[in-house]
Amino acid sequence: MWLRFIVLFFCCIVCSQNKKDKLVYEIISKISEDRLRDDIQTLVNFGTRHTLSDTVSETRGIGAARRWIKKEFEQISDDCYGCLEVFYQNNYFKKNNLRLIKDVWINNVVAIQRGTKYPNRYIIMSGDIDSRVSDPNDFKSDSPGANDNATGMAGTIEAARVLSKFKFENSIIFVGLSGEEQGLYGGQGLAGYAKKNNWDIIGILNNDMIGNVEGINGFVDNKSFRIFSEPVPANESDRQRYMRRFYGGEVDGNSRQLARFIFNSTKKYMPDLNPDLVYRLDRFGRGGHHRPFNDLGYAGVRIMETNENYNRQHQDIRIENNVKYGDVIDGVDFEYVKKLTSVNAINLALLASSPPPPQNLKIGGIVEPSVKFKWDLNLENDIIGYKIYWRKTSSANWEFSKSIGIVNEYTLENIIIDNYLFSIVSVNKNGFESIYEFPSDTFR
């Protein structure tokens, strides 16, 4: 009888895995390079999308661009019988630095695909609406921003088109953020809005430049991309900082776990791509729209191309010494944009289908031969068990794993706590795993 139960249990796991794999591959197949190209061209055609540019014209400036984005989200919602909640999230900022030279409304365009089971748990994909040229305060010159960041914005719209055809347990937010080039103002506004409204955020996938394959060094690479993540939350408490000094976890904050999740799912479902876990908040001394979320303790990463071309980035359109400058559409590789949009779409789907991670996870095993764990048992009937991941302390990613049943404590025999780092995930009946949960406390 017991053997029969074991066989049935593993048959269910295999069946669930097959359904999950089918969903992921179907999503990949539906991402359209042609639609991405058309949307990038449309955004470029607005001439400039500078945060301080025209908001009245129907054909030029950031006002026309954000109205078009909102219209696209509304059309997607119409096609899925109203499955998206589309609105402007408005923020008023007074001039306060060298890049915000006048008072301005910085308006984000938000589309929420509400989850069927956890409507207040959100996984977010963002792109930036605004663009700039060499002078960050020049809001009149043509600033096509084809790669920076029409690619990320078009990818967000395309992900919404595809994922709106499916239902997920958690909510997905697709958002165009404004004011990035002037100082990350749109992200600051939405992160504050999320905190005010008590959003339970799984994480934000910030897409900022996902279309360039030829670097300033001449190298061409259309098979890799970077995932930037900070090591630990910026708002951690003094106690958390104190504990980490003695118990480890210097590279195991919530953003780093999100980055590992994206890395591992990409390697599994898109093996021709080579994701690179970059252990930095962002590029050296620079910033992106995931940072305002990180500042409030939310998990967030930046997904972007491996090779940047600084002749195209933040440049007036011109030719000097036979070198072409400017972020024009000729510099965008649309097949590559499709690949990175697919990376986003499948990770949104996987995380939107995932159960909550184990709560109050504690670790023990000091001066003992085996490491042990305890956590709060999730009593929801679709949780079929948990899975322990571990790695050597010098390794960037999880190396080993062990599936366990519906329990709230477990001892990993003959694995010494000193030599490894650990996390645990929840697994639901459909085979979806939660984000990795790193222990937050200890016990004897």
Model-derived regions, located:
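Active-site-adjacent mobile loop/cap segments within catalytic or ligand-binding domains
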Residues: V44, I210-P231, L277-S353
